[in-house]
Amino acid sequence: MILGIGTDIVYVPRISNLWKKFGTKFLKRVFSEKEIEDSKKYTNFDAQVRHFAKRFAAKEAYVKAVGTGFGKSIKMPDIIVSNNLHGKPQITINNSNIKYKIELSISDEKDYAIAFVVLYTEL
């Protein structure tokens, strides 16, 4: 049974500008240590920005699917976006005992990154 659906689109230059303006302070406020570490596999700044833009969109799409938004119960770094062994994007929630499954699709093209999240339980 589908419990929630969320989507978000991010203007990639916005993430680039925030990173240039606030540096690692911005990264640590929004992304987990794992996401920051994973970005280091890209030697090109633009590829790193796309990496972060897709993860930003995924976090926004997730809270839209849950219906809570960000706040006291969940912070952006608690939502960890990574890839499984086959390269499929996935979301894990830090310090959470969620009782539903999460499906994530992310993509980027030129100046935009998009994410789509579906929350569901098995019948």
UniProtKB/Swiss-Prot annotation:
<keyword id="KW-0808">Transferase</keyword>
<keyword id="KW-0460">Magnesium</keyword>
<dbReference type="InterPro" id="IPR004568">
    <property type="entry name" value="Ppantetheine-prot_Trfase_dom"/>
</dbReference>
<keyword id="KW-0963">Cytoplasm</keyword>
<keyword id="KW-0479">Metal-binding</keyword>
<comment type="function">
    <text>Transfers the 4'-phosphopantetheine moiety from coenzyme A to a Ser of acyl-carrier-protein.</text>
</comment>
<dbReference type="GO" id="GO:0000287">
    <property type="term" value="F:magnesium ion binding"/>
</dbReference>
<dbReference type="InterPro" id="IPR037143">
    <property type="entry name" value="4-PPantetheinyl_Trfase_dom_sf"/>
</dbReference>
<dbReference type="InterPro" id="IPR008278">
    <property type="entry name" value="4-PPantetheinyl_Trfase_dom"/>
</dbReference>
<keyword id="KW-0444">Lipid biosynthesis</keyword>
<feature type="binding site">
    <location>
        <position position="8"/>
    </location>
    <ligand>
        <name>Mg(2+)</name>
    </ligand>
</feature>
<feature type="binding site">
    <location>
        <position position="60"/>
    </location>
    <ligand>
        <name>Mg(2+)</name>
    </ligand>
</feature>
<dbReference type="InterPro" id="IPR002582">
    <property type="entry name" value="ACPS"/>
</dbReference>
<dbReference type="GO" id="GO:0008897">
    <property type="term" value="F:holo-[acyl-carrier-protein] synthase activity"/>
</dbReference>
<protein>
    <recommendedName>
        <fullName>Holo-[acyl-carrier-protein] synthase</fullName>
        <ecNumber>2.7.8.7</ecNumber>
    </recommendedName>
</protein>
<dbReference type="GO" id="GO:0019878">
    <property type="term" value="P:lysine biosynthetic process via aminoadipic acid"/>
</dbReference>
<dbReference type="Pfam" id="PF01648">
    <property type="entry name" value="ACPS"/>
</dbReference>
<dbReference type="InterPro" id="IPR050559">
    <property type="entry name" value="P-Pant_transferase_sf"/>
</dbReference>
<keyword id="KW-0276">Fatty acid metabolism</keyword>
<dbReference type="GO" id="GO:0005829">
    <property type="term" value="C:cytosol"/>
</dbReference>
<keyword id="KW-0443">Lipid metabolism</keyword>
<keyword id="KW-0275">Fatty acid biosynthesis</keyword>
<dbReference type="GO" id="GO:0006633">
    <property type="term" value="P:fatty acid biosynthetic process"/>
</dbReference>
<comment type="similarity">
    <text>Belongs to the P-Pant transferase superfamily. AcpS family.</text>
</comment>
